[in-house]
């Protein structure tokens, strides 16, 4: 999906209280940002933010962080969140602009309990496969940041990406907890959905889901 350029997006991000301008300052000390020692869950590729916001509202004993590479996409998510709730009301959530390849600058070893990869760009061309967020290059980074028994959760509507992801996880010696080839038709209720997922389900699209541990 092509993202429309928004002039001044970088400066506009700073206007929102959920925006973390320099997340690297909290490496190994995210308790200073959240003011507690609760576990951290990270969504890589935030989109519009519905999934993470819903989780944060329900699970107040977990700290949720959302990473988005596109400043424009992040700005839209921040605007939407700002209309819904204040950080005082939802103090267990924060969003930041970063490249997932540089996550080691933001988190230390074992800092994250769970990583969510929801409807990531499939990068269908073979020459672009290293850009996929489930490529081995990214999985090696995630592994270093996940806590003992830490999890990766993947959801996608793209079968080719799902099968690629399973193979990459296997090659990196992750352990499969759950592999579902038709999430919403297997009688499994999943109340936490992204905006894309809601549209796909209404359109009758198949949703694939995987949970794997280190």
Curated annotation (Swiss-Prot):
EC number assigned by the record: 2.1.1.33
Classification via InterPro entries: SAM-dependent_MTases_sf, tRNA_(Gua-N-7)_MeTrfase_Trmb, tRNA_methyltr_TrmB_bact
Pathway annotation: tRNA modification; N(7)-methylguanine-tRNA biosynthesis
A molecular function GO annotation: tRNA (guanine(46)-N7)-methyltransferase activity
Protein function: Catalyzes the formation of N(7)-methylguanine at position 46 (m7G46) in tRNA.
Alphabetized SUPFAM superfamilies for the sequence: S-adenosyl-L-methionine-dependent methyltransferases (SSF53335)
Residue numbers binding substrate: 125, 157, 194-197
Binding sites annotated in the UniProt record for S-adenosyl-L-methionine: 43, 68, 99, 121
Organism lineage string: Bacteria, Bacillati, Bacillota, Clostridia, Peptostreptococcales
Protein name: tRNA (guanine-N(7)-)-methyltransferase
Species per Swiss-Prot/TrEMBL record: Alkaliphilus metalliredigens (strain QYMF)
Active site (record annotation): 121
Example of a GO cellular component annotation carried by this entry: tRNA methyltransferase complex
Keyword Methyltransferase: yes
